[in-house]
Amino acid sequence: MSIKFEITKQNNIHFGIAAVAAALVGYFTSASWWGILLFAAAYFGLINVKLELPVKLSWLWAAILLVIGAILSVFSVQYVLLTDEDFVKTTDMICVVNMVLALAIYLVILFITNNTRLTCTIASIAILAFGFIDYFVYEFRGNEFTYADLKSAGTGLSVVTKYKFVIDYKFLYVILAAVLYIMLVRRIEVQFESAIHMRIISILLTIICVLYVIMNSMSLNTETWEKKGTYRNGYLLNFVLGIRDSFVKAPDGYSKAAVDKIAGNFKETDSSYSQSDAKNPTIIVIMNESFADLSVVGDFETNTQVTPFMDSLSENTLKGYALSSVYGAKTPNSEWEFETGNSMAFLPDGSVVYQQYINDDPTSIVSNLKNIGYTTVAMHPYYATGWSRNKVYPHLGYDETYFIDDFDQTKILREYITDQELYDKIIDRYEKKSDDEKLYIMGVTMQNHGGYGERYGNFNQEVYKVGGSYTDANQYLSLLNESDKALENLITYFKGVDDPVEIVFFGDHQPGLCNDFIKLLNGKGNSGLTEQELENLYKVPFFIWTNYETDAQKVDVTSLNYLSTLTLERANIDLPAYNRFLAELMEKIPAINSRGYYSKKNECFMHVDEATGDEAKWIKAYNILQYNSMFDEKDRSSLMFPYLK
């Protein structure tokens, strides 16, 4: 091996151009001049150096260049996408898995090109460009670029020119690092004596890398909220996990004939589901952020009643507890279960339906009500891009959508718009409706969103646990108390109107509180739980209230996927075919979620795959119908899942 240093006029010209370009870009991106000078020195050295390496060790030099490239690619992408605080959150193990994944990409390209220089150049530029795409997509809409976005790339490109993007100094640093890496690659001549041997080795190493990635990512979930995917899983791995979770396997026994056989039982409207005295009430649905009754986890004492008004509701009220499929986060899955009647029980753990599986117009309570003449309205006092609601709501069939800019942003508690402000907006929209307008409003609150550890000058904690100091729990309980006051104002208003009104209320999930507090309640915390104890962490309160006469009822346990069916029943609206199926399913399987189901036969919670007999039959039918509605566009049942008219 020999190293020679030779300065030429041509190299100096190239160096001057590169240095000036770096300085100009650095000026406009506020990059450190020390970084620019370091690049200039390294570039000057690389452009003038000549390396002669032993041909017999070509495989070693190729391996070194590929490994350096994989490490640099992963580091650069993470560095560009994450803040300094989030950058250090990624574990060493996740970093290694991402680097092995990147190495697999390099090896695949090497297999195709049989050229180390070309491979390293293509792979490093491609992976870095991939990271840049995610950066711009995040700036554009507030969540990351995923595999699902490839299906709607045309829509994104059609509006991207309307947005202004800012490039910061991190871009410059990783681009300069990539330039130096490519310069290094170009200075090293690597030739293989046998292209066939090289390709065999490349494919074998690729298989080893892929197996390593699979074995070390089987327990990982796709993360789609903001940039959690990048710092928890690494961006490259998170994207691949999104591909994995996008392909949901058809259930055993699935076929068009199987769907038709199930649907055939609900072809004619059963008289028990047909309402002759339909009131067509105004229907208001409130999904309240993190609203839960923690006493279902374990008993504890507070200085005052947390939700006195909601606890007092009984007249014209159906109330009880429902199983959510999420705990502490991933709100839109609860929203989706309510709207469609489908269940997370049959989807991959960690998936988020709004961002992974909605690409057409799913049948929902929204579309069904719209088809019978309702005006459908969605309200959420937060950003439209949150969980891609701005893209999903039109698919669901909402006529009107209201987001954070449509609310009075001075009406905040802690950092979020209050429940009361949302309810005032709902009342305002109700008062503007025409006399013959049938109205459906879905309101998703933000007031109680976690975390609960900071103190705020605009919020007084009035409720606290007696005995022990749990700052986050006390703040959370105080927020529930504020929600209860706002709820009382909402119900009081609609008690006084002449038109029939139905209000549906439920929590999306329990809050993410410190494990010590949960351990105080159930004696175990969040681990080592029985199926019953685990399901207690997924219970949320719900009620359906009307300002007209309906039976007072209590429900021990149901699940969010059934609430839209109960909503239509209490509104005296004829049930569509799928809701008739759900009504019968509810009799056999009272509650089902991502963790399991309640077995009437065994009088306990069980895993779905433990079901036997009639229960297994109904769960299988449910799975078949849900798969048909979500993934079989060609043979989607028009009876069970009609499109918007």
Residue ranges and their predicted role:
Residues 2-231:
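Transmembrane and membrane-interface helices of multi-pass
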Residues 8, 136-146, 168, 255-256, ...:
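A diffuse structural propensity rather than consistent per-protein peaks
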Residues 10, 141, 149-161, 169-173, ...:
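Short alpha-helical interface patches
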Residues 42, 76-77, 156, 239, ...:
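Generic structural signal of hydrophobic/aromatic residues within well-ordered alpha-helices
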Residues 132, 159, 187, 242, ...:
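Residues that form generic nucleotide/phosphate-binding pockets
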Residues 150-153, 233-236, 240, 307, ...:
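Alpha-helix initiation and N-capping motif
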Residues 215-285:
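Membrane-interface segments at or immediately adjacent to transmembrane helices
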Residues 270-278, 285-288, 293-645:
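Solvent-exposed soluble domains appended to multi-pass membrane proteins
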